């Protein structure tokens, strides 16, 4: 397996798809890196020469923020929003949707499982016999 930016890249896949295993590299950026390195995107990783692998490594390391650095930046950005107390920061702090989605219904993924309320679901005034 080839290791680029701290991530093991699968050998048996095409380079175009293998690069997308790196956090921070999607389809568009993968294609851009391959064009810069002068590597055909349909070639398999195990067929790459050491020179091509080194070119890919250099381009990714120099020009793009990926993996740990990117994760750290995202975390710090969210922490900054929380610290300054802006609307988005408050939404992050309370684990609610940040981008204006409705929360009366839906938003279950962000809000977590339903919390049961005592006495809820029983008919009022109903007596057991």
Curated annotation (Swiss-Prot):
GO terms, biological process? translation
InterPro entries reported in the protein's UniProt record: Rbsml_uS13_C, Ribosomal_uS13, Ribosomal_uS13-like_H2TH, Ribosomal_uS13_bac-type, Ribosomal_uS13_CS
Which UniProt keywords are listed?
Answer: Ribonucleoprotein, Ribosomal protein, RNA-binding, rRNA-binding, tRNA-binding
Gene Ontology cellular component list? cytosol; small ribosomal subunit
- Bias class Basic residues marks the residues at 95-114
Its Gene Ontology molecular function terms? Answer: rRNA binding; structural constituent of ribosome; tRNA binding
Top-rank taxon: Bacteria
* Stretches for region Disordered: 95-129
Transmembrane portions of the chain: none
Query: Which residues are in coiled coils?
Result: none
The entry assigns this protein to a family as follows: Belongs to the universal ribosomal protein uS13 family.
Oligomer and partners? Part of the 30S ribosomal subunit. Forms a loose heterodimer with protein S19. Forms two bridges to the 50S subunit in the 70S ribosome.
Q: PANTHER family annotated for this entry?
A: 30S RIBOSOMAL PROTEIN S13/40S RIBOSOMAL PROTEIN S18, SMALL RIBOSOMAL SUBUNIT PROTEIN US13M
Question: What does this protein's UniProt record list under function?
Answer: Located at the top of the head of the 30S subunit, it contacts several helices of the 16S rRNA. In the 70S ribosome it contacts the 23S rRNA (bridge B1a) and protein L5 of the 50S subunit (bridge B1b), connecting the 2 subunits; these bridges are implicated in subunit movement. Contacts the tRNAs in the A and P-sites.
Cite the HAMAP family for this sequence.
Answer: Ribosomal_uS13
Name of the protein: Small ribosomal subunit protein uS13
* Native species: Dehalococcoides mccartyi (strain ATCC BAA-2100 / JCM 16839 / KCTC 5957 / BAV1)
